[in-house]
Design a protein with these regions (language model features):
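Short amphipathic alpha-helix segments
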Residues: 30-41
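Auxiliary tRNA-acceptor-end handling modules of aminoacyl-tRNA synthetases
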Residues: 1-25, 37, 46-232
Length: 233
């Protein structure tokens, strides 16, 4: 894996954004730049990278006061992202005990990150800083923001669409196809998660640790059966 440390001679294979692991490194890093830019432009806002969609990832973005997102807002975030990339701002990795990492995120009020880290089962936890912005990523990032040459950001529905490079040709953006039915399917899943009080992966982990795994599976299967019946109609 990309986090494996070498202590003796090994064969090393270099990868780029055409490789699945390399692509995930690129996307994680780009998401962090978007997160920092949104925090810088709109302090107190909340950004959730929700799910993949054709050409990129749909993001739920809530401004403080729940004001509607505008095209000008998106342009301001884009400008800040480009500034971060042009400055080649470094991603600074810190390895800490999980207890220390929990404290870092607790002090900043990131309860979702705290839940995820607490349920990771790891003794040590890596977290990253981009400028003065901290985030937890389940995997490595690129060394600095200057590596992120290909990306796009646009308003989609009530949120943001983060465009990412094409998996076969990372020098150009992946083609985006409008997929309203797929989007509605994901939106319904989010609504069910809210009903079940599962707003993030940490909530799911805690539910499993409390012995509710079978209940989660049964509800998910019931929802899936409902969707299959609807398709058959």
């Amino acid at each position: 894996g990309l986090k494996f440390r070498l202590y003796q001679n090994r064969d090393v294979e270099f990868i780029d954004a055409r490789d699945g692991s390399g692509r995930r490194v690129y996307v994680r890093s780009l998401c962090f730049v978007l997160y920092k830019a949104s925090c810088d432009v709109f302090p107190g806002s909340k950004l959730f990278i929700e799910h993949p969609l054709s050409g990129g990832y749909y993001c739920n973005f809530k401004k403080r006061g729940n004001e509607p997102l505008t095209d000008d807002d998106v342009n301001h975030i884009c400008q800040r992202m480009q500034e971060i990339i042009d400055q080649d701002m470094p991603f600074r990795r810190t390895e800490a005990t999980t207890e220390e990492a929990v404290r870092v995120f607790s002090e900043r009020g990131f309860s979702d990150k705290v839940k995820l880290i607490e349920t990771s089962g790891q003794i040590y936890t890596d977290y990253y800083m981009l400028g003065d912005t901290v985030d937890y990523n389940y995997g490595p990032l690129v060394p600095s923001a200057g590596y992120l040459k290909v990306w796009g950001l646009e308003r989609l529905y009530d949120g943001l669409m983060l465009r990412v490079p094409d998996k076969n040709n990372p020098l150009k953006l992946s083609e985006r196809v409008d997929m309203p039915r797929t989007f509605e399917m994901f939106a319904e899943k989010v609504r069910w998660d809210i009903i079940m009080r599962l707003s993030n992966a940490g909530d799911v982990n805690k539910a499993i640790l409390r012995g509710h795994a079978s209940e989660l599976i049964q509800v998910s299967e019931a929802l899936q059966e409902k969707k299959i019946v609807k398709i058959a109609e």
